[in-house]
């Protein structure tokens, strides 16, 4: 199911193989986010050529549109979308709980209003698992409560307890899954930014012995030093034989921090989100193509990059596409940024294989500061 093939000698970084129903996934792995089963501005064949083996889709959004009955008619999410690689489906918990003025949390589940039309809906751990079972997701995420940064201890403790209770119920549903379904369940540790809650949550989740473990509730607006503190602490509590997933991180410096601490999987909308606004990831930092300085620039965005944009088009032409609001500009920039993330991961894998990851990370972080990487 998960095999570690190389441990870095100077950090907790490692190389692994995660065996999933639609093919093996080499870790560390950056997961592009295809919320509705599709990447914004990227066709499946482009993703496949880039080497994507695992895409994230979102249960909350798919539940609302097109609806579970539509996907069931096609047999599963893979058939509906024609994506023949792996899907990880988020439980939708983050989206539901971000609707703070439109939801009510109970021990049984959560009542919420649709962001589309205001209609009321109710999610339980069992119903969310059932939806993902219908999708035949390759990785299923349990329903959890992602509590915001800055809440008090009592509220964080309450949400952590509910998350643990929901994890037990999800595991029970998973053990009674339909015959032949081989997707892997990842349970989620919470605890906000209180170490004793993190420890309690992780210990209780580990007792349930799910195939994989996710660290939730970090990278939610906290300072980077707090992120690093909880990331390192929570990861250290999880046995090394478990695949580890940190949810919602996707900037290069956060990913390198995660890999350093033994994290195997991560996802974020950031690369394609900033691409849609004309910001491109390069080895020299973010290039903002809308700036006037690029109007007459005949160079490619990045010389060493082999994506469609960099092998064919100039910076000046890409700027023209964005200024003219041509869809091709967004498509090219999105492909470039995803390709960049995959290239970064491949460089990271080579560094781990050669026990050179610590040096590689330091050189990268010395070159890129946090402000330079955020839009």
Swiss-Prot record:
Its EC number is 2.4.2.29. SUPFAM superfamilies: tRNA-guanine transglycosylase. One of its GO terms (cellular component) is cytosol. It catalyses: 7-aminomethyl-7-carbaguanine + guanosine(34) in tRNA = 7-aminomethyl-7-carbaguanosine(34) in tRNA + guanine. One of its GO terms (molecular function) is tRNA-guanosine(34) queuine transglycosylase activity. Residues 248-254, 272-276 are annotated as: RNA binding. It is an enzyme of class 2 (transferase). Binds 1 zinc ion per subunit. Keywords: Glycosyltransferase, Metal-binding, Queuosine biosynthesis, Transferase, tRNA processing, Zinc. It comes from the Bacteria. The active site is at residues 90, 267. InterPro entries: ArchSynthase1/Queuine_TRR (IPR050076), TGT (IPR004803), TGT-like_sf (IPR036511), tRNA_ribo_trans-like (IPR002616). Its cofactor is Zn(2+). The keyword Metal-binding applies. Signal peptide: none annotated. GO terms for biological process: queuosine biosynthetic process; tRNA wobble guanine modification; tRNA-guanine transglycosylation. Substrate binds at residues 90-94, 144, 190, 217. It holds the Pfam family TGT. Zn(2+) binds at residues 305, 307, 310, 336. Belongs to the queuine tRNA-ribosyltransferase family. Homodimer. Within each dimer, one monomer is responsible for RNA recognition and catalysis, while the other monomer binds to the replacement base PreQ1. Catalyzes the base-exchange of a guanine (G) residue with the queuine precursor 7-aminomethyl-7-deazaguanine (PreQ1) at position 34 (anticodon wobble position) in tRNAs with GU(N) anticodons (tRNA-Asp, -Asn, -His and -Tyr). Catalysis occurs through a double-displacement mechanism. The nucleophile active site attacks the C1' of nucleotide 34 to detach the guanine base from the RNA, forming a covalent enzyme-RNA intermediate. The proton acceptor active site deprotonates the incoming PreQ1, allowing a nucleophilic attack on the C1' of the ribose to form the product. PANTHER family: QUEUINE TRNA-RIBOSYLTRANSFERASE. HAMAP family: Q_tRNA_Tgt (MF_00168). This is Queuine tRNA-ribosyltransferase. It comes from Borrelia recurrentis (strain A1). The lineage of its organism: Bacteria, Pseudomonadati, Spirochaetota, Spirochaetia, Spirochaetales.
């Amino acid at each position: 199911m998960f095999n570690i093939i190389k441990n870095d000698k100077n950090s907790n970084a490692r190389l692994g193989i995660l065996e999933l129903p639609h093919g093996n996934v080499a870790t560390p792995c950056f997961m592009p986010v295809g919320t509705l089963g599709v990447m914004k501005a990227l066709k499946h064949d482009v993703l496949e050529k880039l080497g994507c083996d695992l895409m994230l889709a979102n249960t909350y959004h798919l539940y609302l549109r097109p609806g579970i009955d539509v996907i069931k008619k096609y047999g599963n999410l893979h058939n509906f979308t024609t994506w023949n690689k792996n899907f990880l489906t988020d439980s939708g918990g983050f989206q539901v709980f971000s609707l703070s003025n439109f939801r009510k949390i109970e021990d049984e589940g959560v009542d919420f209003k649709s962001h589309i039309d205001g209609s009321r809906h109710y999610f339980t751990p069992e119903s969310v698992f059932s939806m993902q079972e219908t999708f035949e997701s390759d990785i299923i995420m349990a329903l959890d409560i992602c509590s915001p940064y800055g809440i008090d201890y009592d509220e964080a403790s309450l949400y952590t307890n509910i998350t643990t209770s929901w994890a037990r119920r999800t595991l029970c549903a998973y053990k009674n899954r339909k015959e032949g379904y081989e997707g892997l369940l990842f349970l989620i540790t919470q605890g906000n930014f209180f170490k004793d809650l993190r420890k309690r949550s992780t210990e209780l989740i580990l007792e349930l012995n799910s195939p994989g473990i996710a660290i939730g509730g970090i990278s939610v607006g906290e300072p980077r030093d707090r992120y690093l503190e909880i990331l390192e602490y929570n990861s250290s509590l999880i046995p090394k034989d478990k695949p580890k997933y940190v949810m919602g991180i996707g900037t290069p410096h956060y990913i390198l921090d995660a890999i350093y601490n033994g994290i195997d999987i991560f996802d974020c909308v950031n690369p394609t989100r900033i691409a849609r606004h004309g910001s491109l990831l390069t080895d020299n930092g973010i290039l903002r193509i809308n700036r006037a300085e690029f109007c007459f620039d005949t160079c490619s965005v990045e010389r060493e990059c082999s994506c469609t944009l960099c092998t064919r088009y100039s910076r000046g032409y890409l700027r023209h596409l964005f200024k003219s609001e041509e869809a091709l500009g967004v498509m090219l920039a999105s492909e470039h940024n995803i390709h960049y993330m995959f290239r970064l991961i491949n460089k990271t894998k080579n560094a781990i294989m050669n026990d050179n990851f610590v040096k590689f990370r330091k050189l990268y972080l010395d070159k890129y500061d946090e402000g330079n990487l955020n839009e």
